[in-house]
């Protein structure tokens, strides 16, 4: 195997189309399906005692990264966009990555670290943008898949191992988010599924899907739907009970911890999903949503890079895929300063075309227009005062024969819930 540093290959919408025909895309879909089917009817184990040795090693690695957070406290004082101390944490992680991987997996091919470390680092959020989102989760899943491909993790991970590895990771990144106030990456705001995550909802819903379910029985309730229906997420007490054994409920519990107010207001999509009859239908919708909103969105997958072995930029038949080079992209035309023209237009002396400026940087033309308006208003007010003083009814509130104007109010919303007209709520894939 010849490993190489992962490179950017997705720079345009056309590259996303190529990505959908690539080996990495097929691998990621396969991992999602495999992990989902593996964890069906399984609970998150209370500890790692029954895990394979290699799985325990990965769990230990994640916990060491968590300990680094304790060694790197956030900077004091208010911050609007994340705490820059997370960059120090990233620096420490990057400096220790080779040692952490070789300690966890003594048989690792040292050459593979150049590719593996990219997906590990990417799974911890953005060092530059101080954010965390679904693209970072994708990177960590690629890291786990890479370990499997190299034989460092079992190819067929048992359900307890899948659940415990990913829940340990989710606990780690939630700690990162809370400690360093990481922003949501590419969030859809209130109309997104979750500010930061998607994978726990896929794996957690899969846990409550019966193996007897088929494509034609997605809406037929099973014992899992009757024992703990999807609507249970609206009950904080049940959420607390379920979060220790189910990844979906653990993610919901995190939302309850960090958000206040009615659930249907801050998480309307998850609220709508809670009304679906079966977990099988929810899981099916979560997969479709992930494919569309994560794997199919340029802002997310543009940060997924490609090496030569683990995730090569090749199609499923092994052929190299085309990609847009940065220099091929349409350059952004800079805006010309006020008063200047492009080279195609006749150029005059620039300062001769600039407007005369008045107070506070306003053009004198604007200042004069505002002064005229204020003068006209003052004249009208003076005329009204004189009118009232002379006993005129003009402008007198409640005067006989005067018609009262209705109070001004905003036009009614055309969307339930008060959204602006035309801003219909995003429908989930499972919505009919």
UniProtKB/Swiss-Prot annotation:
Residues 366-389 have a biased composition (Basic and acidic residues). GO terms for molecular function: peptidyl-prolyl cis-trans isomerase activity; protein tyrosine phosphatase activator activity. Residues 322-432 are annotated as: Disordered. It is found in: Cytoplasm; Nucleus. Keywords: Cytoplasm, Isomerase, Nucleus, Rotamase. Residues 396-412 have a biased composition (Low complexity). Its EC number is 5.2.1.8. CDD domains: PTPA (cd04087). InterPro entries: Phstyr_phstse_ac, PTPA_C_lid, PTPA_sf. One of its GO terms (biological process) is DNA repair. It holds the Pfam family PTPA. Belongs to the PTPA-type PPIase family. This is Serine/threonine-protein phosphatase 2A activator 1. It comes from Yarrowia lipolytica (strain CLIB 122 / E 150) (Yeast). The lineage of its organism: Eukaryota, Fungi, Dikarya, Ascomycota, Saccharomycotina. The gene is RRD1.
């Amino acid at each position: 195997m010849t490993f190489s540093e992962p490179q950017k290959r997705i720079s345009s919408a056309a590259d996303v189309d190529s990505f959908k025909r690539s080996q990495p895309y097929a691998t990621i879909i396969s991992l999602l399906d495999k992990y989902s089917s593996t964890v069906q009817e399984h609970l998150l184990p209370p500890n790692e005692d029954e895990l394979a040795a290699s799985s325990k090693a990965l769990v230990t690695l994640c916990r060491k990264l968590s300990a680094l957070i304790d060694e790197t406290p956030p900077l004091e004082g208010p911050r609007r966009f994340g705490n820059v101390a997370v960059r120090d944490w990233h620096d420490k992680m990057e400096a220790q990555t080779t040692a952490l991987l070789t300690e966890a997996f003594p048989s690792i091919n040292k050459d593979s670290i150049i590719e593996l470390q990219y997906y590990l680092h990417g799974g911890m959020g953005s060092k530059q943008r101080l954010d965390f989102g679904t693209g970072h989760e994708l990177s960590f899943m690629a890291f786990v898949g890479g370990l499997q491909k190299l034989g460092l993790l079992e190819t067929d991970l048992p359900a307890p191992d899948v659940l415990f590895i990913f829940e340990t990771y989710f606990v780690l990144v939630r700690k990162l988010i809370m400690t360093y106030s990481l922003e949501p990456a590419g969030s859809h705001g209130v109309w997104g599924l979750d500010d930061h995550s998607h994978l726990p909802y896929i794996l957690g819903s899969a846990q409550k899907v019966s193996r007897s379910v088929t494509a034609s029985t997605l809406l037929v309730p099973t014992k899992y739907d009757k024992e703990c229906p999807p609507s249970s997420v609206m009950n904080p007490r049940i959420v607390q009970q379920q979060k220790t054994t189910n990844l979906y409920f653990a993610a919901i519990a995190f939302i309850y911890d960090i958000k206040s107010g009615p659930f249907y207001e801050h998480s309307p999509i998850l609220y709508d999903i809670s009304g679906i009859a079966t977990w099988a239908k929810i899981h099916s919708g979560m997969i479709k949503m992930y494919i569309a909103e994560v794997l199919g969105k340029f802002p997310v997958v543009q940060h997924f890079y490609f090496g030569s072995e683990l995730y090569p930029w090749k199609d499923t038949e092994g052929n190299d895929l085309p990609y847009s080079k940065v220099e091929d992209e349409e350059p952004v035309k800079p805006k010309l300063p006020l008063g200047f023209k492009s080279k195609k237009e006749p150029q005059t002396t620039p300062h001769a075309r600039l407007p005369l400026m008045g107070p506070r940087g306003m053009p004198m033309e604007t200042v004069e227009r505002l002064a005229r308006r204020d003068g006209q208003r003052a004249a009208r007010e003076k005329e009204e005062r004189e009118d009232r003083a002379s006993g005129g009814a003009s402008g007198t509130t409640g005067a006989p024969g005067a018609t009262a104007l209705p109070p001004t109010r905003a036009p009614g919303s055309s969307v339930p819930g008060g959204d602006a007209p035309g801003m219909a709520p995003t429908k989930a894939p499972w919505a009919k």
